[in-house]
């Protein structure tokens, strides 16, 4: 817990030298890995702020806190392993009350978007779906429920994971290298630190609203 507090303090104070400490940065990697794994892998955790964390990772690479290739490798593994977990949920547990309950709690618009993409584009939907929050967690579950073979799924899983992580992280890095952004570096880093927290709170509140509405309608 003390290390987490140190990381938050270093981010808030823009102390990149402290963040670059090997022990501290290893915890940063772990937190990012766990967040992406859970967001991609578990339907109840689909509100976690994966995209904004990748933007933050790109900004930290620009500050020499993290290194590009190891970051891409670690976060791609997190996203792809999480996506595999989502696929396994659909393949093995798709007809259980638990998974059906998770699916029922997600907003209907994401069900419709994921179903439309999967029906129209099949596995190619995984490539585009990675860039859509909630949808990237739903699609692998739907692929598992449909009985799609693990071998075919894994190819598109790892390819889409690599594309998503590389594109969004690179965008965060490129954004941090723009002269205007460099001149307002402190404000940008503060924004990138607050954004995942704000999205997390918004996701939690949105999920609670959906759950309460469904319980009220079923009462």
UniProtKB/Swiss-Prot annotation:
Q: Entry's InterPro entries? A: DedA-like, VTT_dom
Keywords, sorted A to Z: Cell inner membrane, Cell membrane, Membrane, Transmembrane, Transmembrane helix
SS bonds (residue pairs): none
Spell out which residues lie on the membrane's Periplasmic side: 39-67, 182-191
| Ranges annotated as spanning the membrane | 18-38, 68-88, 161-181, 192-212
Q: In terms of one coarse class, where is the protein primarily found?
A: membrane
Q: How does it sit in the membrane?
A: Multi-pass membrane protein
Which stretches of this protein does UniProt put in the Cytoplasmic compartment?
Answer: 1-17, 89-160, 213-219
Q: Does the keyword DNA-binding apply?
A: no
Localization per Swiss-Prot or TrEMBL: Cell inner membrane
Q: Spell out the family assignment given in the record's similarity comment.
A: Belongs to the DedA family.
Quote the protein name from its UniProt record: Inner membrane protein YghB
Source species: Salmonella typhimurium (strain LT2 / SGSC1412 / ATCC 700720)
